[in-house]
Amino acid sequence: EGIIYTDVLVEVLFADDNDANLTNGTPNDIAIIQAFALHGITLLSNAVIAHSPISIAPANIDINISANISATYSWALSSANCFYRVNDNTNWNTLSMTANGNNYTATIPAQPNGNIVAYYISLTDNYGFESGINPQESNVIPIKDANLPFFVMVGYELYEEEDFDFNVGFWQTGHPSDIATTGMWEIGSPIGSYDDPSTLSGMVQPAYQHTPNGYACAFTQNASSINDGIGANDVDGGHTTLFSPYYNLTNYTNPAFTYWRWYTNNPSSGANPGADWWQVMITDDGVNWEYVENTL
């Protein structure tokens, strides 16, 4: 997927065309489009959705979502949509985004205090194929296999923030039950890991963390340099564990946690893609744990 493959698709359509006008279709356009779509290539594969995520919103006020959408083949853009769901609902609601030039907007209905709204943006081309998902792959079904969407916390106030830079917190890396031989959790400055270090493409471990102007995060072991192979210090041999501090939430109503994470399990040059999994769990007594995320 990307600009090169999309250009190849367009060249094939031009070769099939009989009136030098792709906007009105070609004799075999449906078969061509469907064949390329089987490989994840659409007319909008190189579209760019510029969007500033909404993370906090006041209660009982509509939540306005806006994005700037640009595409090389803008004539192929049929619609832009915002999908959202509330709390534990697994069904997505669809909002058609209104266009004003390259700017698109949608309004998520007002929500009461304590609700958490998940949402993502996607594009549909003239042939009905979805593309340009933002965040990428957040539309995958079942939800456990999907990337995280954007989340809006309605009516919440920030109580504690731990970013490993300005407030580290009492995090614990590792547990006696861990059996991983490489890729153990560390806290520090990450070194990027790439399928192709010469072009910095195919990123497996980011070379940066999320906090603006920060440098540190928790990660599963650095390689010696970005020139090492992606398997140099990946997680091998078993699991590794990272524990947050304990938080006393006795005096709080409907508390919520947020976190930023990067996880990949299918690099194109990986030795065994798709064989590992990611799990996040939470407990209120230190004994009984519930899954927050589980890709197994």
Describe the predicted segments one by one:
Residues I30-G183, P245, N265:
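Glycan-association/targeting regions that enable binding to alpha-glucans and other polysaccharides
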Residues L77, G270-Q279:
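Short coil-to-beta strand junction motifs in C2/discoidin
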Residues L249-T253, W262-G274:
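Extended, low-complexity, turn-rich repeat/linker tracts enriched in Gly/Pro/Ser/Thr and Asp/Glu
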